[in-house]
């Protein structure tokens, strides 16, 4: 009897997953198109040169300090900013997103788009202060 209940529960869970997954996939592809357009725009603009040099110059995987940041070194702030870029990479799985997110010490349109896509805009002021602190020139 317990085996039948377990099998029924697994089948029910699989049916629910099949109904939910296409909707989740559809929402994520809309955001993916926006990020592709933004990256393509940046490749042709003045930020594009910085983006290309950032993508050519790879930082170590675990490196938390960005040498383009000339302000106050605060490991906690760098960690918060880098966390946004890593989450954005996990959302889009595009290495250019990570490097573009770090350009100009996180002060760029890709970082802002990542914040919007990750639903972090209610914390915008916190991140803006962090960028100003670590990125003063």
From Swiss-Prot:
GO-annotated cellular components: extracellular region
Main localization of the protein described in the UniProt heading: secreted
Protein name: Mandibular organ-inhibiting hormone
InterPro entries in the record: Crust_neurhormone_CS, Crust_neurhormone_H, Crust_neurohorm, Crust_neurohorm_sf, Hyperglycemic, Hyperglycemic1
Signal peptide: 1-26
GO molecular function, one term: neuropeptide hormone activity
SUPFAM superfamilies listed in its UniProt record: Crustacean CHH/MIH/GIH neurohormone
Record GO biological process: circadian rhythm; neuropeptide signaling pathway
Keywords on record: Amidation, Cleavage on pair of basic residues, Disulfide bond, Hormone, Neuropeptide, Pyrrolidone carboxylic acid, Secreted, Signal
Location within or outside the cell: Secreted
Source taxonomy: Eukaryota, Metazoa, Ecdysozoa, Arthropoda, Crustacea
Stored Gene3D superfamilies: Crustacean CHH/MIH/GIH neurohormone
Residue numbers bearing the Pyrrolidone carboxylic acid modification: 63
Species: Libinia emarginata
Role noted for this protein: Represses the synthesis of methyl farnesoate, the precursor of insect juvenile hormone III in the mandibular organ. Also has hyperglycemic activity.
Disulfide pattern: 69-105, 85-101, 88-114
Disulfide bond among keywords: yes
Modified residues (Valine amide): 134
One Pfam entry name: Crust_neuro_H
Tissue-by-tissue expression: Produced by the medulla terminalis X-organ in the eyestalks and transported to the sinus gland where it is stored and released.
UniProt record similarity statement: Belongs to the arthropod CHH/MIH/GIH/VIH hormone family.
